[in-house]
Amino acid sequence: MSSQPSKDLETFENPQPGRDYTIRIRVPEFTCLCPKTGQPDFATLFLDYVPRARCVELKSLKLYVWAFRDQGAFHEKVTNEILNDLVAATDPNFMRLTAEFNVRGGVYTTVVAEHRHPDWQPPVPVTLP
């Protein structure tokens, strides 16, 4: 595997395909460019997903995220693009991507995008006493 930025996402087989479980990934150093000003925008990405057959490989995710450093994109567009690419690579039961962008001009932006597989029924939440 290269150490250059790349839009190629690698995956591996889910080691527990018969169980619903959540994978949580935090990416604190996401950067893209504002398409209006060309200035860098910084964000922390929070990825939560319930895998089906495939899981995303973490080094390829890091290189994928790096590939946005010189790309101009609005926050809403880039968040949904990343979610779409991750869904295409892994076909999860459920995936949520939260992008918390750093302040720009006194405004904080958080974009939350979700995907739910049409055949998946989430488990009933457990309420502890």
Curated annotation (Swiss-Prot):
EC numbers: 1.7.1.13
Enzyme class: oxidoreductase
Family annotation (Pfam families): QueF
Sample GO molecular function, one term: preQ1 synthase activity
A Gene Ontology term for the protein's cellular component: cytoplasm
Keywords (A to Z) from UniProt: Cytoplasm, NADP, Oxidoreductase, Queuosine biosynthesis
Binding site for substrate: V56, E57, L58, H75, E76
This protein's pathway: tRNA modification; tRNA-queuosine biosynthesis
Keyword Cell membrane: no
UniProt-listed NCBIfam families: QueF-II (TIGR03139)
Function: Catalyzes the NADPH-dependent reduction of 7-cyano-7-deazaguanine (preQ0) to 7-aminomethyl-7-deazaguanine (preQ1).
Designated name of the protein: NADPH-dependent 7-cyano-7-deazaguanine reductase
Species whose genome carries this gene: Thioalkalivibrio sulfidiphilus (strain HL-EbGR7)
